[in-house]
Amino acid sequence: MRMYLSSFRLGEHPDRLVALLGGVGGAGPGGVPIAVIANAIDDRPAEVRAACVGSEFVALRELGLHPTEVDLRMFFDRAPGEVAAALAGFPAVWVRGGNVFLLRHALARSGADGVLVDLLRRDAVVYGGYSAGACVLAPDLRGLERCDDADAVSEVYGRPVRWDGLGVLDHAVVPHVGSPDHPESALLAGVVADYRARGVPHRTLRDGQVLLVDGERVTVV
């Protein structure tokens, strides 16, 4: 299992993401293909969402990668095999931050949650992402409503919120902690306090830091 989980954007160690990709086959003419999942920002106006996706593309291309968006909304309420086929050609995924509850809903409703968990357990994909893209991997998402609006799921998709995470990690990830330049840093300090009070296992990341998983080796850099 290989994961590059950043607090904000690519963080301070994008070379480590490239290194994780070294074991996933060769690059094509445009670089190593990477699927970009941006459904955590499905609540934003279309033009704003497109600009945000574009900024992710620019950053990933600078690393020699070839990004393509896989919009999970295109696979809502369809057979999981369809999203599996869409993701099959990518040795890596990049899951953008935003609202973790929107992201969780999109992953579940498209069937991408089960597909990604299976790919990770078979070490068939490198999972990269930041903020909500890291948080969604926890066993449970309760507590994050202090920062992200859980009601956004019903407002955007007309469905109830899901509180379960993907369970890939055995602990929660709390980004932007001790990051005064990030507007949600104080809110996430409250999430940490809540987790400590409830005994919820968690790791904190400041902006710039990355949680790296490479097989059995887990480090924060």
What spans do the regions from the language model cover?
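A short, terminal or domain-edge coil/loop segment
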Residues: 87-97, 119-133, 149, 183-193
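Conserved anion/nucleotide-ligand pocket segment
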Residues: 164-208
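Class I SAM-dependent methyltransferase SAM-binding "motif I" and its flanking Rossmann-like core
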Residues: 105-108, 113-179
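N-terminal start-of-chain detector that recognizes signal peptides
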Residues: 1-5, 65-66, 99, 142-148, ...
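Extended, subdomain-level signal for the structured scaffold at the beginning of enzyme domains
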Residues: 1-101, 189, 196-221
